[in-house]
């Protein structure tokens, strides 16, 4: 019983830490403003589940896409308007080279080093922002997750008391740092916080806002619909400088 209570205390404490560490959006009236959709887009994390969807859907929208990847063979997408650059987000030189000439950057950065402390997400994001500033790229759309900042506890009991504290504490702490770094920057940014991801087909619809998710059950969304939402933010100011939840 004592160990169980200590574990519950640990999980609750971690949720509070994530709440304070991540960005806390101030809900403001939606401007509804739109702008010309960027045609030259850099996608970081392009070989992940969401990243591949971003590449495919951006190409469908007519964008000229640059994908920064560590292993080009993992992307498995061929297209005349796709430029694949081999590099590492932790290497500023490769990030800077990939950012040159872009109009916007989309980050679906992730990794699978879950079980020890890492700053891959936050350090990589610093390099992205530095390169954007160097080349005058103004718009960043970044994927993090529900369960961070003012969405802490909104991934349901299963994530709050098992998945995050047992499997992903370091990952979520670094996502929190990533959000804070973005929020402190001068770029035009939107953070997308999806619920639990799956590989279902795109439904073309989603719920999004500052109060998405709940404390009891886990909300879900496909990677395809997350990619669709993120691409829509390139030409919309509705959630400018906000961290917004997105789910079905």
Predicted regions and their residues:
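Conserved beta-loop-beta element that borders a ligand/cofactor-binding pocket
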Residues: 179-200
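Glycine/proline-rich active-site loop of Rossmann-fold NAD(P)-dependent oxidoreductases
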Residues: 150-152, 201-208, 233-242
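N-terminal Rossmann NAD(P)H-binding glycine-rich loop of SDR-like oxidoreductase domains
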Residues: 36-61
């Amino acid at each position: 019983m004592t160990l169980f209570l200590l574990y519950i205390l640990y999980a609750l404490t971690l949720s509070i830490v994530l709440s304070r560490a991540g960005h806390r959006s101030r809900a403001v009236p939606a401007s509804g403003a739109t702008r010309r959709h960027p045609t030259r887009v850099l996608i970081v994390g392009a070989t992940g589940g969401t990243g591949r969807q971003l590449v495919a859907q951006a190409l469908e929208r007519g964008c000229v896409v640059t994908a920064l990847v560590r292993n080009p063979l993992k992307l498995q997408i061929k297209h005349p308007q796709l430029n694949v650059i081999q590099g590492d987000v932790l290497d500023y030189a490769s990030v800077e080279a990939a950012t040159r000439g872009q109009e916007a950057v989309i980050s679906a950065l992730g990794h699978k080093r879950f079980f020890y402390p890492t700053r891959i997400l936050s350090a990589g994001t610093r390099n992205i922002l530095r390169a954007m500033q160097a080349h005058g790229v103004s718009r960043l759309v970044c994927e993090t997750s529900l369960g961070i900042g003012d969405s802490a506890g909104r991934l349901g009991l299963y994530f709050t008391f098992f998945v995050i504290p047992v499997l992903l504490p370091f990952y979520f702490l670094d996502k929190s740092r990533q959000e804070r770094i973005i929020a402190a920057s001068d770029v035009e940014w939107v953070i997308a916080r999806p619920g639990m991801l799956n590989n279902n087909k795109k439904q073309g619809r989603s719920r999004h806002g500052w109060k998405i998710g709940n404390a009891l059950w886990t909300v879900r969304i496909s990677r395809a619909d997350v990619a669709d939402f993120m691409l829509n933010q390139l030409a919309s100011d509705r959630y400018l400088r906000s961290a917004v939840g997105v789910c079905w």
